[in-house]
């Protein structure tokens, strides 16, 4: 009899502990697995758009490959091997600076990803139905257009109506939801058409309400 009472008490203690732990477990499961911010407000979306601007630049890379550089005899201590590769139009294998092609490519697509995340979040909130969300949508579209404009000019032939089928770049119009997705590059003409579409949609929405 004593053993039965002990088992009953033990069972009740275990059940009570489980009931106490359930809310804590639910709270844990409610957290994002990687601590990302849930974009559930206009202010959070506006803050995200800071990341829709690339931290890296491209003019230095293009300048070293241009006719404006004509002297390589004197090498500065700050000279990077990749800069000579730009000058000689060689494949860039010694990329270490923020202006390296690999850095420009990845950083501008990261900026595009931030813009697309903002656009998706605006849709999930019911659309751009407030002045702040309208302005945020406009900024995201313009940022996306500009980043693609930089990429298509740095990595592709410049737009020429006589050669509309020149190979372009992937135009990212939505946030990625799967690992290592495959994209079509399309043509330079198609990229410019999408840039124009984003600009025409985004520009009328921009105002100073979020600045």
Which residues does each predicted region cover?
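N-terminal, post-signal-peptide region of Sec/Tat-exported proteins
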Residues: 61-86
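Acidic helix-start/capping segments at beta-turn-to-alpha-helix junctions
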Residues: 70-72, 136, 142-143, 172
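Short amphipathic alpha-helical interaction/hinge segments
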Residues: 29, 33, 152-159
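Terminal processing/anchoring signals of secreted or surface-associated proteins
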Residues: 25-27, 115, 145, 195
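Conserved, well-structured interaction surfaces
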Residues: 84-155, 186-189, 201-210
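Short coil/linker segments at helix-helix boundaries
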Residues: 154-197
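Sec-dependent bacterial lipoprotein signal peptides
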Residues: 1-25
